[in-house]
């Protein structure tokens, strides 16, 4: 574990953006602090929101600063996650068994052929009873497969380039390797090829792509529901992908998103009782995927040093009850529909650090649906089309040392989340607020409240860092349970009115800034009445 976290990655900020932001900051610092009489109001969605009770009276005090001081977070050591280390993860001494067998007899393939007339899809694609290539009872590499599988199902079309025209299943006892001897493995879109692993799979120094034989090119995204080949690993599996390029995989179908690491479906998991899947994806590139990365009930997975570019829905999307994840040093950009990086629904005790997430359709980084105990540190989040970092209904998280710059809406947005610690973050040149905290009643929305409960409460501690040149102001927090501020550098927004604190902070702005800026003390803002008391 690293006791001293550093942020030594190069920052390829657009030159004009940095020049403008730094010049503006210098001018603002020279201007000193000016207090505004007319605070700006940030935009906030109003549809489907119940009117919540607003506390009318807050106390402003200056607590001791000692409890607010915190050591830098200890981040995982990444030095062991290398291609060389991955190559040592599997045993190659026992040759495995290769067969071509019916899909419907295999637990690992039931998701794709059972119910809803799914079988018919594969009958049409294969023009017969659906079959798959099976690997079991030992080690097999792609060249072994080519030697034993009929050429109509798997063939070499040019030196080192192979086309698979059936699904490939790595069974629980199987070990499958694709390495540098393979220049490219093409999974046929028309024939319905894909890869599923219940065992061990190692993919290094190669390319694996979804391929349209009809168009003689990548199976480029056209519509959400058009089948595109994918890679999926199930419960108990171990997967390592390193120095590999993957493109044009996945579509809008369960477990078929692109590269997915998932526990079995609940009913199957109860029967098989296999552990959570795990593994690494490192130093690789993913483009035009439905999801660049997805996981479900996965443990200790490492996503490090990858490029996720121009993917469709999400770049990186760990989901339901995954934990102990490391998402580090990735470059995520150009996501077309939603967020660059999102963890959602009880994704806990994980690390998101030293990533770049930029130019995504919505937010750069999102913590969502009761994801707690996470550390988000030293990330560079810029030029996203909504917020930089967004926390939805996810308390007890630490954001440390992030640079959140030139996002179109808020720099950091915190909704219905308590005990959020914001330490040493820079939010600069964002379209609305530098930091925006608010509550929202979700009962009248399409949210499943039993599955994803929430409390309409927000509280945060903000220590150090800088909020400067944000379009609507440095900071706005509506109806908080509490707010603590200390050593926060707040420079003027782009508007000429000077510093303007919004929400309840604006009502006591003079007192807050006197303590925080002039006296350099900590500030604690507490409501006299709690939400419970107000409702009663």
From Swiss-Prot:
Impact after mutating residue 294 to A: Retains 24% of epimerase activity
Record annotation: effect of changing residue 296 to A: Retains 66% of epimerase activity
Catalysed reaction equations from the record: [(1->4)-beta-D-mannuronosyl](n) = [alginate](n)
Consequence recorded when altering residue 319 to A: Loss of epimerase activity
Record annotation: effect of changing residue 338 to A: Retains 87% of epimerase activity
Effect after changing residue 345 to A/Q: Retains 10% of epimerase activity
Mutation effect (residue 452 to A): Retains 63% of epimerase activity
Any one GO BP annotation for this protein: alginic acid biosynthetic process
Pathway noted in the entry: Glycan biosynthesis; alginate biosynthesis
InterPro entries: Beta_helix (IPR039448), Carb-bd_sugar_hydrolysis-dom (IPR006633), Mannuronan_C5-epimerase (IPR053409), Para_beta_helix_rpt-2 (IPR022441), PbH1 (IPR006626), Pectin_lyas_fold (IPR012334), Pectin_lyase_fold/virulence (IPR011050)
UniProt repeat feature PbH1, residue ranges: 298-320, 322-345, 347-369, 371-393, 394-416
Keywords: Alginate biosynthesis, Isomerase, Periplasm, Repeat, Signal
Impact upon substituting residue 339 to A: Retains 49% of epimerase activity
Subcellular location, record wording: Periplasm
Signal peptide residue numbers: 1-36
E.C. code: 5.1.3.37
GO CC list: periplasmic space
Function description: Catalyzes the epimerization of beta-D-mannuronate to alpha-L-guluronate during the synthesis of the linear polysaccharide alginate. In addition, is part of a periplasmic protein complex that protects alginate from degradation by AlgL by channeling the newly formed alginate polymer through a scaffold that transfers the alginate polymer through the periplasmic space to the outer membrane secretin AlgE.
NCBIfam families: epimerase_AlgG, para_beta_helix
Domain remark from Swiss-Prot or TrEMBL: The C-terminal region contains a right-handed beta-helix (RHbetaH) fold, which is common among proteins that bind and cleave long-chain linear polysaccharides.
Entry similarity comment: Belongs to the D-mannuronate C5-epimerase family.
Protein name: Mannuronan C5-epimerase
Gene transcribed to yield this protein: algG
């Amino acid at each position: 574990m690293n006791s001293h976290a550093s942020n030594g990655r190069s920052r390829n900020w657009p030159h004009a953006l940095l020049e403008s932001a730094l010049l503006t900051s210098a001018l603002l610092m020279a201007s000193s602090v000016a207090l505004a009489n007319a605070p700006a109001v940030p935009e906030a969605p109003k549809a489907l929101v119940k009117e919540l009770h607003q506390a009318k009276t807050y106390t402003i005090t200056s607590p001791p600063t000692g409890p607010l001081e915190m050591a830098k977070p200890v981040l995982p050591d990444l030095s062991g996650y290398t291609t060389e280390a991955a190559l040592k993860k599997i045993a190659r001494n026992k040759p495995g068994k290769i067969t071509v067998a019916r899909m419907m007899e295999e637990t690992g393939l039931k998701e794709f052929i059972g119910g809803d007339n799914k079988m018919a899809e594969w009958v049409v694609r294969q023009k017969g009873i659906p079959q798959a290539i099976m690997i079991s009872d030992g080690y097999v590499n792609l060249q072994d497969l080519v030697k034993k599988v009929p050429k109509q199902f798997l063939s070499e079309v040019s030196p080192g380039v192979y086309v698979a025209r059936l699904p490939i299943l790595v069974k629980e006892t199987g070990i499958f390797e694709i390495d540098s001897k393979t220049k490219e493995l093409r999974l046929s879109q028309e024939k319905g090829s894909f890869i599923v692993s219940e065992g061990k799979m190692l993919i290094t120094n190669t390319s694996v792509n979804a391929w349209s034989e009809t168009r003689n090119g990548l199976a480029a995204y056209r519509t959400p529901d058009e089948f595109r080949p994918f890679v999926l690993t199930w419960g108990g599996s171990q997967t390592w992908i390193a120095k590999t390029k993957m493109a044009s995989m996945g579509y809008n179908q369960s477990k078929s998103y692109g590269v997915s690491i998932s526990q079995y479906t609940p009913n199957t998991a109860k029967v098989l009782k296999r552990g959570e899947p795990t593994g690494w994806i490192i130093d690789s590139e993913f483009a035009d995927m439905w999801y660049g990365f997805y996981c479900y009930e996965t443990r200790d997975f490492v996503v490090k040093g990858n490029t996720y570019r121009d993917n469709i829905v999400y770049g990186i999307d760990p989901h339901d009850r995954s934990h102990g994840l490391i998402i580090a040093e990735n470059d995520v950009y150009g996501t077309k529909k939603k967020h660059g990086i999102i963890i959602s629904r009880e994704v806990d005790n994980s690390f998101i650090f030293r990533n770049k997430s930029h130019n995504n359709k919505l937010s750069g980084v999102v913590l969502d649906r009761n994801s707690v105990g996470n550390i988000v540190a030293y990330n560079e989040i810029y030029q996203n089309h909504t917020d930089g970092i967004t926390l939805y209904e996810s308390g007890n998280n630490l954001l440390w040392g992030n640079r959140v710059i030139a996002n179109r809406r808020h720099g950091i947005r915190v909704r219905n989340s308590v005990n959020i610690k914001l330490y040493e973050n820079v939010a600069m040149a964002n379209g609305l607020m530098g930091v925006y905290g608010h509550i929202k009643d979700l009962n009248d929305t399409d949210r499943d409240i039993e599955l994803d409960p929430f409390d309409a409460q927000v509280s945060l501690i903000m220590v150090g860092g800088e909020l400067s040149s944000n379009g609507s102001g440095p900071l706005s927090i509506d109806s908080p349970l509490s707010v603590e501020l200390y050593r926060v550098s707040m420079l003027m927004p782009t508007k000429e009115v000077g510093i303007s604190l919004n929400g309840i902070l604006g009502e006591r702005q003079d007192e807050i800034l006197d303590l925080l800026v002039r006296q350099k003390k900590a500030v604690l803002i507490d409501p006299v009445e709690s939400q419970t008391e107000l409702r009663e």
